Amino acid sequence: MMDIRYSCNQRDFKRYTTEETRKEFLIENLFQADQVVPVYSHVDRMVTVGVMPVNEVVSLDKGIDIWKNFGTSYFLERRELGMFNVGGEGKVVVDGVEYELGYKDCLYITKGAKVVTFESKDAAAPAKFYMVSAPAHCSYETRLIKIADAAKKPLGAMETSNKRVINQFIHPDVLKTCQLSMGMTVLEPGSVWNTMPAHTHERRMEVYFYFEVPENNVVFHMMGEGQETRHIVMKNEEAVISPSWSIHSGAGTSNYTFIWAMGGENQAFDDMDTIPTTELK
């Protein structure tokens, strides 16, 4: 069943309790054996999905009323989708074409793909497919991007606790998409901060998915307007929705990795409003 999240404005958000904030923006329990776990956000109509095939070959539309939720005859009739495997070895079949995904490999599936299935090579070490889908009006090319083939951009420094590598997968410099962009940021041991100085992008929303968070550790994800911030305490393999008006930054009790996904008006990465760190409140 689709979990529907409606849009929230920044004025109402200021009055949210901790419980309300988590219910509105946090996505938990994405990986359930042989199930499709979908969350539909009305912010730019992005859908976040988790699939963990264990004993079955799992279809993308399993348990989803496609007409009720999308008004189409199949999931990707008017959508594109990007996914990462954050588990064991797995296979994705798209309209009869097989794609092998290892750990941290990425697959972009273009608009119009009708039949998409998932399976794991080893039920004892199942694949975990984390994916985000955005509306699309045109088709490009379904493509597998291995972690080794991602565009890599080292940033930050140990002195500022944010030494990291940004891996660009579904990105204009790597392949063409309708509006979806996705990548993976890996923090080095000893670094804990991401996306600081913080920013917003008025014409795009973003979803963060935190993983490789060690046991008994958490990430404090910062959100809200720069002048009135809030936080959500997040555990391993959880995602969080970030509306266009909200910052999206985080600090962990250890280093970690996160996948970012964006959709909206454009794919211009410099179309953002940076907030000086000393001006945050």
Report the location of each language-model feature.
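A short beta-strand-loop-beta hairpin characteristic of the jelly-roll/cupin
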Residues: 75-102, 211-236
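Acidic, low-complexity central loop/insert segments
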Residues: 87-126, 132-135
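Double-stranded beta-helix
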Residues: 123-164, 224, 259-281
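Short, glycine-/Ser/Thr-/acidic-enriched flexible segments
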Residues: 53-54, 89, 215, 247, ...
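Conserved metal-binding segment of the jelly-roll/cupin
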Residues: 101-121, 233-254, 263
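Non-cleavable N-terminal signal-anchor transmembrane helices
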Residues: 1-48
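A short glycine-rich, His/Asp/Glu-containing loop-to-beta-strand
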Residues: 28-69, 163-206
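Acidic/His-leaning functional-site neighborhoods
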Residues: 40, 44, 176-239, 243-247, ...
